[in-house]
Amino acid sequence: AIVHDVMPVFELFQPTTVDDTLALLDTYGADAWVLAGGLDTFDWFKDRNKRRKVVVDLSGVESLRGVKKAADGGLEIGASTTLTDVANDPLVKQNYRLLSQAAALVASPQIRNQGTLGGNVSQDTRCWYYRSGWTCYRAGGNICYADTPTAINREHAIFDANRCVAV
C-alpha cells in the first residue's frame, strides 16, 4: 500500500558557504537532497518514493542569492534568488525586461516570494501519474498514462508528443 502525506526522517544540514555545501553533497552524493525554496521538495517527500537521508538547506548560503552584473557585462543570478527578487531587480528590469516580466507572471505572489530560480529550473515533472507512483515512461515503465483517452491530463502538453507528454 502507498502511504501518502507521511514525512520521512532525514538529517538536515544548513551550510553557510558554497564550499561547505559542495563538501556535503560530495560526502552524501545521491543520498542528499538540495533544498532552496522547498515548494516542490516536501510534496515529493510526502507523496512519492523520493527519500533522502540528508537534506542540504541552501537558505543560509548568502552568495547564492541576488542579482549582479557579470564581468562580461551579462547578468549573474544566484540559484537561491526568489522569483519576486528576479522580477523586481532594477538590473533585470532595465536590461532583461522579458525575464523580469516572465518572473512576475509565474504562479501566485506567495509562490514567487518563496520559489527560487534554481528550484524552478530544476524542478521535477508535474505529471499526476508520475508523481503518484505509476510505472509510466518517466518512471521506467512502457506507457504514458496521461496520453490516453480517459487520462487526467490537464497539466500536460499533449500536442505532438511521441512518448511522455508531461511538462
Question: What is each of the regions a protein language model found here?
Answer:
Residues A1-V167:
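C-terminal structural segment of proteins
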